[in-house]
Structures are given as structure tokens and as C-alpha cells.
Amino acid sequence: MNLNPLVAMSKTKYLLGVAVMLLGISPAYAERWTLTSKSEVGFEIKSMGVQLVGGQFKQVQSVMHFDPTAPQQGSTQFVLNVDSLQLSKPSLRHMILGEDLFHAQKYKTVSFKSTRFTALGPDQYRIAGNLTLRGVTRPVIFHTSLKPNTGNPKLLDVQSFTQIQRSDFGMKKAMGGVGEKVNIQLKGQWRVQ
């Protein structure tokens, strides 16, 4: 097969151009981060301003692609193992993991996948995405602080929170004095990979 060198060169330039365009619109330059083992992902439920119960997920899979110079290209996702939940009031474990709330026997994980990072100011971001809980997916917004760690350039200090209504995710409403609003929090550090 005898190819015209000009045609071959044009195809090469075209493919190179497509590759450059794809790299330009993907988070290719963003670094990959994972949560450190000391980070905490959990929730608290209050009633009349008093904390009724708090919980922390001990098994968390996480990844974030993030470049502070181009935060709009950032993305993050995490998966929480429901059975790894540790409660501030262990006596409520059966109720919290039961059918009326987490229904852990059927729904093994809670997950979040971002759809948009928005910079609000120095180290402040709004991370929109989809939270899946009990097989129900709803949009949520995490209000987030991501600050370079002063002692280690490979770490970002993070504090992030959102609030949901339990009944939006199929959890039984107004149960035994348990509040309808749930605060979900993440605090700790992201480590660059």
C-alpha cells in the first residue's frame, strides 16, 4: 500500500489536534487526591438544636481530581460502607441501620459523585453533585473549604458539609423524636497521589 506522504501527515496532525483538544477539556492536569485515614466522613441528627446522634463511616473509598489553579475542572466521588458506621450512641445502631432509616441489609453503600466545582473565594468552593442513599439519588451541594496544609505540601485540609432531609431519600419521617434534617460532614485531609 502506497500512501501519499501529505495525506499521512495531515492525518497525523488531525489526530494530534484531537488529542490536544481532549486533554484541554478534561481534568488531565488536575492531581489525584485521596482522603487520609484520619479523615472523618459522618453525620449528625439534631432535634431542637440538640444532637441526638452522630455517626462516622469507618470504611470510605474516595478520590478527588483537583488543581487549585483550575478548580472548575475538579471532580470528586466517594463511597461509604454503611455497615462500617460507628455511632455516638451505639444503643441506636439497630434502629439507624434498620429498614426505616439506612436499611443496611438491602443498601450496602452511600455514594456521592460531583457534577460541578465552583470557586467562591480563597480556598472556598461549592461542590454540586448527586448523593445516592437507599437507592435514591438526589442533587446536593457541599460547602467546602480546601486549604493547603501549612506543614505538608502534599496535603489539603478539608472541611465540607451539606444538609439533607431524611424523607427525601425514603427514610421514615418523624421517627421516635429523630430529627428530619441530617447534617453530613467531611473533615480531614486529602493527600496527593
Predicted regions and their residues:
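Bacterial N-terminal signal peptides that target proteins for export
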Residues: 2-16
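Bacterial N-terminal signal peptides
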Residues: 17-24
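Low-complexity, acidic/polar, glycine-enriched regions of mature
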Residues: 29-193
